[in-house]
């Protein structure tokens, strides 16, 4: 393993010298395939089809000389066919890890009673660790880890899941030394799982009491980076499904083709990989390719067979850095004591409709800046606080769905409707100011500066780890920031004073504070912020 990691570092050194980004900002790609042995929704021949899918994925990676991460659900791990496949045919340097969905054979091996309808039941209260007590979670971890070591000779270093609770993740790290985890992208309601407002891409150190929430301190964090999965379109994924109970999907998944975009559309794949390889990312960028075998080979084949050679080509060109999930986890821990600031910058959109999107994340907040032509708004701002304990940390979830959220200041999805696009806009004389010719500039390791032109002067937006700055220093007219939402939106805001606004999200109190500027309540919007000396500065750190 030391030799493998040394090789990775050498590749990083070569790759980082070749692309336009800063030398300390590698663009990692993980090919992660997670493996189930059973899928009750498929019908006859299900087990054979699932196995055939995984075998074909592995063969294609071998053909193009790529290493992958294969994460095994318990039922697949104890199946001799998968054991032989991965022991004999898996390419050197690839990785076998754990996929943390809970199945009937896993539960029964732990001496617990299975409560599901099927041997694998995807509902939150039986199919995920959140549906079990803390003591049950420990037993489930112990049984899996010992069986894995019995089969493969070591404990897994990577554990993935659509979502995983902090108690389980912390226990895995302390007792078994896992080095990396991965969790589903942000989504609202898809499959009954809501993960909303989190660190948008790349990776973060999670809170000890909430695995979805980035931690702010070393004492408050689990020292295992959580990587966000599936490769969301930074322009179109967010708004997909506004006005409905569930988001659509525009991701790198090889089966995806929502609205003519996604991982089965060659042009979109090329656009996405190019954007992630060349756009400004600050500390590093991260792409997860691959697919769960439940979608079956015939459905994913076309997209998978296009993506793998495209990825191989970009690795050969030095634009992407190939790594397993655990290698990324070790690199992250070697380079960051705390969650770094990262960004995803889409300077155009696949449909060529003059849309742009910038995602910025730090350990304190995330923000999305969005353009539709020159029309600009902050589409999303969510704050992070490691003290917000998950509903599932110390008690089992009892519902078939689940919910993980953070602390919203702006939510352009939940507070919008088909008629109203919610957002925080720059306004002058009651009209939204367009921001033309935006330029994105990196300042140091953690700051993005966005410059552009408005009718009242040049605007400068600065995204720092602990604050957001909006300034038009030599304005030719009055301006302000205004939050507009759909009138029916459920908002978290409470008492407002000139320098602070109180808020509450599912019973957790937080505040929004201004370093410069002042809050004003107004009848034509939810609230406004008036600048001071040409600037508005939000403090994004939740006070202790």
Question: Which sequence ranges carry the predicted segments?
Answer:
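Beta-strand-rich recognition/accessory modules
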Residues: 19, 261-265, 287-290, 500-544
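Catalytic grooves of carbohydrate-active enzymes
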Residues: 36, 52, 56, 146, ...
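Metal-dependent polysaccharide deacetylase catalytic core of the NodB/CE4 family, i.e.
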Residues: 74-163, 221-253, 281-295, 405, ...
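Catalytic domains of cell-wall/extracellular-matrix polysaccharide-remodeling enzymes
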Residues: 133-208, 466-468
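Acidic-aromatic substrate-binding/catalytic surfaces of carbohydrate-active enzymes
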Residues: 369-448, 456
């Amino acid at each position: 393993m030391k030799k493998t990691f040394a090789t990775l570092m050498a590749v990083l050194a070569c790759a980082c010298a070749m692309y336009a980004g800063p030398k300390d900002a590698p663009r990692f790609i993980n090919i992660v395939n997670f493996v189930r042995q059973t899928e009750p929704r498929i019908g006859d021949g299900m087990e054979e089809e699932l196995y055939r899918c995984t075998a074909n994925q592995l063969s294609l990676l071998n053909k193009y000389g790529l290493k992958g991460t294969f994460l095994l659900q318990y039922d697949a791990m104890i199946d001799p066919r998968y054991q032989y496949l991965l022991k004999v045919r898996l390419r050197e340097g690839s990785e076998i890890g754990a996929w943390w969905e809970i199945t009937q054979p896993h539960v029964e091996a732990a001496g617990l009673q299975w409560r599901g309808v099927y041997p694998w039941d995807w509902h939150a209260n039986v199919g995920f660790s959140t549906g079990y007590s803390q003591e049950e979670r420990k037993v489930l971890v112990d049984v899996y880890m010992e069986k894995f070591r019995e089969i493969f000779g070591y404990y897994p270093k990577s554990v993935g899941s659509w979502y995983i609770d902090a108690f389980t993740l912390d226990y895995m790290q302390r007792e078994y030394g896992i080095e990396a985890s991965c969790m589903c992208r942000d989504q609202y309601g898809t499959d009954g799982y809501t993960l909303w407002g989190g660190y948008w891409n790349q990776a973060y150190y999670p809170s000890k009491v909430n695995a979805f929430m980035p931690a702010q301190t070393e004492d408050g964090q689990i020292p295992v980076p959580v990587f966000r999965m599936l490769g969301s379109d930074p322009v179109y994924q967010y708004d997909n499904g506004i006005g409905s109970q569930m988001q659509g999907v525009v991701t790198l998944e090889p089966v995806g083709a929502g609205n003519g975009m996604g991982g089965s559309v060659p042009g979109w794949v090329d656009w996405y990989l190019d954007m992630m390889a060349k756009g400004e990312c600050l500390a590093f960028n991260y792409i997860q390719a691959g697919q769960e075998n439940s979608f079956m080979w015939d459905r994913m084949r076309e997209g998978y067979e296009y993506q793998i050679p495209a990825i191989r080509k970009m690795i050969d060109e030095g634009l992407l850095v190939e790594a397993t999930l655990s290698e990324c986890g070790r690199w992250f821990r070697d380079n960051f004591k705390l969650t770094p600031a990262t960004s995803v910058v889409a300077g155009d959109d696949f449909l060529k409709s003059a849309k742009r999107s910038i995602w910025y994340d730090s350990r304190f907040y995330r923000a999305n800046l969005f353009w539709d032509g020159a029309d600009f708004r902050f589409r999303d701002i969510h704050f992070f606080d490691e003290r917000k304990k998950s509903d599932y940390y110390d008690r089992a979830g009892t519902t078939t769905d689940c919910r993980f959220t953070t602390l919203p200041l702006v939510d352009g999805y939940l507070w919008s409707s088909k008629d109203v696009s919610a957002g925080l806009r720059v306004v002058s004389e009651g009209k939204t100011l367009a921001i033309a010719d935006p330029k994105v500039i990196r300042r140091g390791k953690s700051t993005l500066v966005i410059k552009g032109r408005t009718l009242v002067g040049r605007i400068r937006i600065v995204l720092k780890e602990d604050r957001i700055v909006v300034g038009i220093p030599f304005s030719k007219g009055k301006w302000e920031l205004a939050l507009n939402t759909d009138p029916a939106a459920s908002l978290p805001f409470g008492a407002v004073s000139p320098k602070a606004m109180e808020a509450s999200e599912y019973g957790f109190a937080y505040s929004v504070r201004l370093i410069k500027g002042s809050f004003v309540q107004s009848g034509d919007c939810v609230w406004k912020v008036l600048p001071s000396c040409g600037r508005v500065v939000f403090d994004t750190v939740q006070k202790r």
